[in-house]
């Protein structure tokens, strides 16, 4: 994943925007480091991603408490080991990154012209991308920003779908096929 882009859009254009170097893979890296430091266990990227998807949560969602048994290699003995990692264990690494997103979103809203405040209250904030699926992120951001935050119905694909729609490729999306033949030199 690349950066997290945050923008206020109005009348088909960008009013205010910023990017932060926080994305799904950054959560994975922080979880990887956490497991290494707390348990002295090396895990792979896939295991870190599974922890993010199934166990990690922002703290506002207090009814979400999961534990997952993971397998890795002990950094002390070099042997395979099993460790149980809980939602509470992942609080710090998850919140460190979520707070960066919340702060950046807050700054964008602060710089947004006041005449758009009504639209923001009415329409709220829409989360897109894979990171939008992090448990509790919508609740956390809603609390931080004081507006409703929702996740796109198809957060992983909506950016690509929106781009295709803006390029007038809607009909190709419906059939599921798009001619991606390079058009270099053609008129």
Question: What positions do the PLM features span?
Answer:
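PAZ/PAZ-like end-binding module
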Residues: 74-81, 85-86, 105, 145, ...
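Acidic, glycine/GT-rich loop-and beta-edge segments that sit at the periphery of enzyme/chaperone cores
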Residues: 44, 48, 165-187
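Phosphate/ATP-binding catalytic cores across multiple sugar-kinase/actin-like superfamilies
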Residues: 93-121, 166-169
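Short, surface-exposed connector motifs at secondary-structure boundaries
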Residues: 13-15, 117-123, 145-148
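Glycine-rich phosphate-binding loops at beta-strand->alpha-helix junctions
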Residues: 117-141
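Conserved phosphate-binding/catalytic loops in two-lobed NTP-binding clefts
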Residues: 139-165, 173
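A short acidic Gly-Thr/Ser loop motif
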Residues: 1-3, 9-13, 23-25, 31, ...
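Phosphate-binding glycine-rich/basic clefts of nucleotide- and phosphate-handling proteins
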Residues: 9-95
